[in-house]
Structure formats: structure tokens, C-alpha cells
Amino acid sequence: MGPERHLSGAPARMATVVLGGDTMGPERIFPNQTEELGHQGPSEGTGDWSSEEPEEEQEETGSGPAGYSYQPLNQDPEQEEVELAPVGDGDVVADIQDRIQALGLHLPDPPLESEDEDEEGATALNNHSSIPMDPEHVELVKRTMAGVSLPAPGVPAWAREISDAQWEDVVQKALQARQASPAWK
């Protein structure tokens, strides 16, 4: 018995359970009866686990107890692809929900979609420079920002040399130039 074995003597194996053609993530592998009884020798058809490349006999897939079949997991994360079920396929969605419940997981309900939120979101995406606010909120923001002062080391020298009126003129010209030029999206 070498370092390739678990303390119990059973070989360590990772696999993907394939049920009806659907591939799931790493799942528990149900031990066979000899492993449950604490049999120390290797089981028929199983090899020692090691970090080396899998042998040909380990790559073969076969049917196990209760119709389960085993498929080795992909060890290269860059090649891993996730297939998403089509939104309209109710059977697949129901199957996924059943699996989530069987695993004891709870996912929060999706937020309710509202037409008002969609319109506001579309408007905000089209016009990045404005946030819809009522006049009272605008005044509150102005009063709050008027009270903000930056520490002297935080203000660059060029900003100390320009007056507020000159700065407003620079900002207005920049805004007009941005509105006149085509968007670079």
C-alpha cells in the first residue's frame, strides 16, 4: 500500500455521474460492497489513484450499480465548457430545479421585472450624464457638495491656479465638444 491510497485503503476516484445523458459536477461515488466491508485489496476494475496520466482502463466508461455510469472529470479548466439549457425548455428547467432541491440548496427567487424599471434602465443607458432626481434632491446634492473640501495635498497645483469661473468654462467646452462628436461606443 503506497501514498496513493486513502487511509481506509480504498482507492480515491473522482468521476462525473452521467444520468440519462446529462452531465453533472463531481458527485459522490457509491462504494461497492467490498469497500464497505473494509476490504484492503484493490477491487476488480479499479486502479490505484495517482497524479499521473490516467491509464486506458480508467478511461473506459461502464455501467455501475443501479444503472449509473462513470466518466472521468476534465482536469483542464480552460477546455471546460458549460452548456446552458434553452430558456423555453420547461422539462430541463424542472429537472434542474429538482436537482437543486435534492441537493438541499436554496436559490433566491428572481426579482420581479417591471416595465417602469426597464424604461428607466434604458434611459440611464442612453444618457449617462443625468440621474433622474426631483428638484429637492438636486438642491440637497448641491448643498452637500458645497460643504465638501479636499485636503490641500489632494488638490493638484494646476487646480489651485485656475479660478472656479475658468474651470466652469473649461468643463462647459468639454461637454459641448463631447456632445458634438460621435460616440465611440
UniProtKB/Swiss-Prot annotation:
This protein's name: Male-enhanced antigen 1
Gene Ontology biological process terms from the UniProt entry: cell differentiation; male gonad development; spermatogenesis
Pfam families registered for this protein in UniProt: MEA1
Expressed in which tissues: Highly expressed in testis.
Domain of life: Eukaryota
The entry's keywords: Developmental protein, Differentiation, Phosphoprotein, Spermatogenesis
An example Gene Ontology CC term for this record: cytoplasm
Transmembrane segments: none
Role according to the record: May play an important role in spermatogenesis and/or testis development.
Gene: MEA1
Ranges where the record places region Disordered: 1-90, 104-134
Residues where Phosphoserine is found: S114
Comp. bias (Acidic residues): 50-60, 112-121
Keyword Transcription in record: no
